[in-house]
């Protein structure tokens, strides 16, 4: 019985993190993202490789000071 409960809770946790996440314009959900480039620091030189679950800018976009993902020329 406890094994079934564990499997059920594990499946629910996976579904709630991957399907319940809504990202903004030019963003995508990453289950293990890190070191997101920004307008202030477009090139990340040092990265800790720490997994951060959540929305990050799509490839080719940078996060501006307002928290929006924009093309580099819009910074």
Swiss-Prot record:
GO terms for biological process: defense response to bacterium; defense response to fungus; killing of cells of another organism. It comes from Bombus ignitus. The keyword RNA-binding does not apply. Keywords: Antibiotic, Antimicrobial, Disulfide bond, Fungicide, Membrane, Protease inhibitor, Secreted, Serine protease inhibitor, Signal, Target cell membrane, Target membrane. Residues 1-20 form the signal peptide. Expressed by the venom gland (at protein level) and expressed in fat body. Residues 23-75 form the TIL domain. GO terms for molecular function: serine-type endopeptidase inhibitor activity. Pfam families: TIL (PF01826). It is found in: Secreted; Target cell membrane. Gene3D superfamilies: Laminin. InterPro entries: Ser_inhib-like_sf (IPR036084), SerProtInhib-TIL_Domain (IPR051368), TIL_dom (IPR002919). May be O-glycosylated. Antimicrobial venom serine protease inhibitor. Exhibits inhibitory activity against chymotrypsin (IC(50)=19.56 nM, Ki=15.24 nM) and microbial serine proteases, such as subtilisin A (IC(50)=6.57 nM, Ki=6.83 nM) and proteinase K (IC(50)=7.11 nM, Ki=7.02 nM). Has not activity against trypsin, plasmin, tPA, thrombin, factor Xa or elastase. Binds and inhibits Gram-positive bacteria (B.subtilis (MIC=29.45 uM), B.thuringiensis (MIC=91.03 uM)) and the entomopathogenic fungus B.bassiana (MIC=30.09 uM) but not to E.coli. It comes from the Eukaryota. This is Venom serine protease inhibitor BiVSPI. Belongs to the serine protease inhibitor-like (TIL domain-containing) family. The keyword Membrane applies. GO terms for cellular component: extracellular region. The record marks 49-50 as: Reactive bond. Disulfide bonds join 23-55, 32-51, 35-47, 39-75, 57-69.
């Amino acid at each position: 019985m406890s094994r079934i409960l564990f499997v059920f809770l594990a499946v629910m946790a996976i579904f709630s993190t991957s399907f319940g996440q809504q990202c903004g314009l030019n963003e995508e959900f990453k289950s293990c993202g890190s070191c997101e480039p920004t307008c202030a620091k477009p090139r990340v030189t040092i990265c800790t490789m720490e997994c951060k679950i959540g929305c990050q800018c799509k490839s080719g976009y940078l996060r501006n000071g307002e928290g929006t993902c924009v093309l580099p020329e819009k910074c």
